[in-house]
Amino acid sequence: MKLNLAVKIGQLDMINPVTTASGTFGYGQEYSPYVDLNQLGAIVVKGTTLEPREGNPTPRLVETPSGILNSIGLQNSGVDYLLEHYVPFFKKLQTNVIVNISGNTAEEYGQLAARLDEADGIAALEVNISCPNVKKGGMAFGGDFRTAAEVTKVVKNSTALPVIVKLSPNVTDIAEIARAVEGAGADGLSVINTLLGMAIDVRKRKPVLGNTMGGLSGPAVKPVALRAVWQVYKAVHIPIIGMGGIMNATDALEFILAGAQAVSVGTANFVNPYATKEIIQGMEKYLMENGIGDINELVGAAHL
């Protein structure tokens, strides 16, 4: 049986539905000894800001039951460094390179999108709207449908690249925000970003993370992420990249059945650098065993 694993996220053609979560795969180079990057549907690289950022105080990572808390604080060398040092590598790849962007203001997102729009080797932008809005007292852009839509619109007006907006789960109604972002022109959605959490050292009687709170990822968040994908799929008509605790092909297939067109592998990369490759192989095996020729037949099939 000939299998079709190819999917589309807006104008983005992917040879299969598997990509990587920003911040867990570096800039691709770090994992190239383990995985043929060109065999992935896409790679999403580490988050980029307009100016270099040092990130949050240490410790920045702590293991929790079935997950990891991280508080990296968007440490990166800034967009100029990305364009000079990483884009030449991106140009050599056949796979789609998606750059994750963050800003302190809507204007910063727009400036960043415009800079990246000029570069070859970048296939799409993923917009992290979980950042604090410095003009609105630090509330996350993604916490309110109006500011989420505003950032989306500014980015869309600043680039011809496909725009994928990464939604925060730390909200009351994720479907409302998804609809607002779709209305503002988003080409796709990444669902979900990390859940806000913390850990406390009982000996020191202090939070473990240097920044007190951090983002929870890994298997612990999977039921929440699946629920979010299910709700968003029913609310919008644009494609979804599902993520949150995907460790194997079975996890990935659950997200696709819930409505995700593609899936993003994050924490699993830390545990097993071959995770993405093994998930693709597991998907192929499932399709063969079940007599399904096209992965797209499974998208949202659990809703039927």
Curated annotation (Swiss-Prot):
Belongs to the dihydroorotate dehydrogenase family. Type 1 subfamily. Substrate binds at residues 46, 70-74, 128, 193-194. The lineage of its organism: Bacteria, Bacillati, Bacillota, Clostridia, Eubacteriales. FMN binds at residues 22, 46-47, 100, 128, 166, 192, 218, 244-245, 266-267. Binds 1 FMN per subunit. Transmembrane segments: none annotated. GO terms for biological process: 'de novo' pyrimidine nucleobase biosynthetic process; 'de novo' UMP biosynthetic process. This is Dihydroorotate dehydrogenase B (NAD(+)), catalytic subunit. Keywords: Cytoplasm, Flavoprotein, FMN, Metal-binding, NAD, Oxidoreductase, Pyrimidine biosynthesis. Gene3D superfamilies: Aldolase class I. Its EC number is 1.3.1.14. It comes from Desulforamulus reducens (strain ATCC BAA-1160 / DSM 100696 / MI-1) (Desulfotomaculum reducens). It catalyses: (S)-dihydroorotate + NAD(+) = orotate + NADH + H(+). The active site is at 131 (nucleophile).
